[in-house]
């Protein structure tokens, strides 16, 4: 909870670790390259890992020993976590600070829980209501777990660590949190985020709505990260919106859903945006 006079970090304020010594210089451009190589490498590894004989053998062994696919597929989250942590550790080693600070997983979290509760209410509560009306709300944990595990745990944590934590927050240690260069990098990170939500084949052209909506959502998540300077905001919203989508039984990914689903999604975006503008506004003395 946040007192009326409490605000989250202003977008114009620097964190304690952003000292003059750690501001961007041309000689540190290689750190940006390291972050992007790790990020792209992690995405490629998760996308193509099923083509590796050794990987298939391990998964077959796990399946034969009764390990369900919903648990076996946590290897994708592990890949994302390793890439993000390694990248943040390298940046922190060179520029100073802690790895968790560089990834924006630590520091002031004032007001975040309150904002997330308000913002995700339309999607989650609306999702429960819509699911009950449609008769598709599944209270069988064993049946709902695979979808919940993938959409509410693996995807929000892994994708936010890579596309906002590694490719935006870590890179911001070199280029700053403002200006054209920051937003150019943010757009490229968001396009990469959108690309993992469409097929990487000839069917991709038919998935352009999902690509555009997801990429735009990625830019919005970056804006939230820049305002709050906390990755937990985008992780929480990402998880909450996916949970609402799951409860409603919506189909079509980010570019799909009917008018009810999209009204609730817009409501969540509107509440989060308004709350962010109000709660992150600098208090004038």
Which residues make up each language-model segment?
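Transmembrane helix-loop-helix hairpins at the membrane interface
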Residues: 146-285
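A generic structural micro-environment signature
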Residues: 7, 109-111, 234
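A generic alpha-helix propensity feature with a strong bias for hydrophobic helices
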Residues: 12-14, 125, 202-205
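Juxtamembrane helix-loop-helix connectors linking adjacent transmembrane helices
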Residues: 55-72, 93-162, 168-178
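Residue-level signature of transmembrane alpha-helical entry/exit and packing/kink sites
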Residues: 28-36, 72-81, 111-119, 143-148, ...
């Amino acid at each position: 909870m946040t007192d009326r006079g409490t605000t989250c970090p202003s977008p114009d304020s620097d964190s304690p670790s952003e000292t003059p010594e750690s501001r961007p210089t041309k000689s540190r451009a290689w750190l940006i390259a390291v972050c992007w190589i790790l990020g792209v490498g992690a995405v490629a590894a998760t996308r193509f890992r099923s083509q590796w004989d050794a990987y298939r053998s391990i998964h077959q062994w796990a399946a034969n020993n009764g390990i369900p696919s919903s648990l076996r597929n946590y290897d994708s989250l592990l890949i994302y976590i390793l890439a993000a942590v390694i990248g943040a550790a390298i940046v922190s080693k060179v520029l100073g600070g802690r790895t968790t600070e560089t990834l924006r997983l630590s520091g002031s979290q004032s007001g975040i829980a309150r904002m997330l509760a308000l913002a995700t209410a339309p999607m989650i509560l609306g999702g429960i209501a819509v699911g009950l009306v449609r008769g598709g709300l599944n209270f069988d944990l064993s049946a709902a777990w695979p979808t919940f595990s993938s959409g509410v745990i693996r995807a929000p944590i892994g994708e936010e660590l890579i596309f906002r934590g590694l490719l935006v927050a870590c890179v911001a240690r070199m280029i700053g949190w403002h200006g054209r260069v920051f937003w150019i990098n943010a757009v490229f990170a968001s396009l990469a985020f959108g690309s993992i939500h469409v097929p990487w084949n000839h069917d991709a052209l038919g998935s352009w709505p999902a690509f555009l909506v997801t990429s735009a959502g990625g830019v919005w998540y970056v804006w939230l990260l820049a305002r709050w300077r906390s990755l937990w905001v985008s992780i929480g919203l990402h998880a909450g919106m996916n949970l609402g989508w799951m409860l409603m039984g919506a189909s079509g990914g980010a570019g799909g859903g009917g008018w009810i689903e999209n009204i609730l999604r817009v409501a969540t975006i509107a509440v989060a945006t308004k709350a962010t503008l109000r709660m992150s506004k600098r208090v004038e003395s």
